[in-house]
Amino acid sequence: PISIYATILHGAFGTGRMLVTLHDIAILLCISLAVTPAFRMRFWNTGAEGQVLIGCLSTAVCMLVLGGKVPDGLLILIMAVSAILSGVIWGIIPAFFKAHWNTNETLFTLMMNYVAIQLVEYFLKVADKTGSNVVGPDLLTHGWFPEIFGVKYLLNILIVAIVCVAMHIYLRYSKHGYEIAVVGESENTAHYIGIDVKKVIIR
């Protein structure tokens, strides 16, 4: 068993693998940050997977349609905006139902994950006529983050670190963060002090 665990640790943190592991951790941390405001309100959003899939789908479309036609810097910006907007729209749907009809956000967002999975699978089949369900690097050659100091994933990790700090400041020191905290503690209290609870939930 010791040798097995040693192999696992070496595979994750050994030479050349540390940044890959940190990159994977950064992705998971970024997804966690996306649902942090909802959890702060004690609304159990289990739809992060669906939002990520829809965001990935929109960025892949941008790569396929605009790759090679616009500079990579502009393409990355378009992809980022597209991913954020598509993820927000996907998240607003259960938030709207929760705010207006008090639906169960856990089940709603969980079911939307399966809708997102089917949508991505459908578009994979449209893009890939071979039936392999893979749109590989040969098609997605533009819009990748550049290397910094020859390090492939450093920029990704730095961006997530900045987002993490920004989220902490937003939740702890902003008016919106205060409203989120109050709604999470007590919706009745939030109503009493004049907070628009429906607006906070959807936002």
List PLM regions with ranges:
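Single transmembrane alpha-helix segments in multi-pass membrane proteins
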Residues: 3-66, 84, 88-92, 96-103
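Transmembrane helix-bundle core of multi-pass membrane transporters
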Residues: 11-16, 105-173, 200-203
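Membrane-interfacial loop-to-helix junctions in multi-pass transporters
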Residues: 15-17, 25-28, 69-76, 152-158, ...
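Short, amphipathic, aromatic/basic-enriched membrane-interface segments that mark the entry/exit
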Residues: 16-20, 77-81, 148
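Hydrophobic faces of alpha-helical transmembrane segments in multi-pass integral membrane proteins
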Residues: 26, 30-33, 54-58, 62, ...
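Short loop segments and helix-boundary regions at transmembrane helix junctions
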Residues: 39-47, 68-135, 170-175
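Residue-level recognition of membrane-helix boundary sites in multi-pass small-molecule transporters
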Residues: 48-51, 74, 105, 155, ...
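Membrane-helix/interface signature in polytopic inner-membrane proteins
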Residues: 166-202
